[in-house]
């Protein structure tokens, strides 16, 4: 009995992973990680109040990003640096 339950759960898990992979392939998972996607997200977080680069905005060094953001050196965008406060 226990073996059949374990086998059933394993088969369901494999089917879930397979279905998820097929769905991601249909949608084009590379579109989520592309720099074009980051640039489109930049428009959402734009603010006219500050002269610094906002969250997910393009950068080349940490000083270009707003407070509490740091420039990521893989795709060169501003992301949270893990600090809190004002």
Curated annotation (Swiss-Prot):
Residues 1-21 form the signal peptide. One of its GO terms (cellular component) is extracellular region. Belongs to the neurotoxin 10 (Hwtx-1) family. 37 (Jztx-31) subfamily. This is Mu-theraphotoxin-Cg2a 1. The modification Phenylalanine amide is found at residue 84. Disulfide bonds join 52-66, 59-71, 65-78. InterPro entries: Huwentoxin-1 (IPR011696). The presence of a 'disulfide through disulfide knot' structurally defines this protein as a knottin. Its main location: secreted. It comes from Chilobrachys guangxiensis (Chinese earth tiger tarantula). Residues 22-50 form a propeptide. The lineage of its organism: Eukaryota, Metazoa, Ecdysozoa, Arthropoda, Chelicerata. GO terms for molecular function: ion channel inhibitor activity; sodium channel regulator activity; toxin activity. Inhibits both peak current and fast inactivation of voltage-gated sodium channels (Nav) channels. Inhibits the inactivation of Nav on DRG neurons (EC(50)=1.77 uM) and peak current of cardiac myocytes (IC(50)=0.90 uM). Expressed by the venom gland. It is found in: Secreted. Keywords: Amidation, Disulfide bond, Ion channel impairing toxin, Knottin, Secreted, Signal, Toxin, Voltage-gated sodium channel impairing toxin. It holds the Pfam family Toxin_12. The keyword Signal applies. The keyword Secreted applies.
């Amino acid at each position: 009995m226990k073996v059949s339950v374990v086998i059933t759960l394993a088969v369901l898990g494999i089917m879930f992973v397979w279905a998820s992979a097929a769905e991601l392939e249909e949608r084009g998972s590379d579109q989520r990680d592309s720099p074009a996607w980051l640039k489109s997200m930049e428009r959402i977080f734009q603010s006219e109040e500050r002269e610094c680069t906002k969250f997910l905005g393009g950068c080349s060094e940490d000083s270009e990003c707003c407070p509490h953001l740091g420039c990521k050196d893989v795709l060169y965008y501003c992301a949270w640096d893990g600090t809190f406060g004002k």
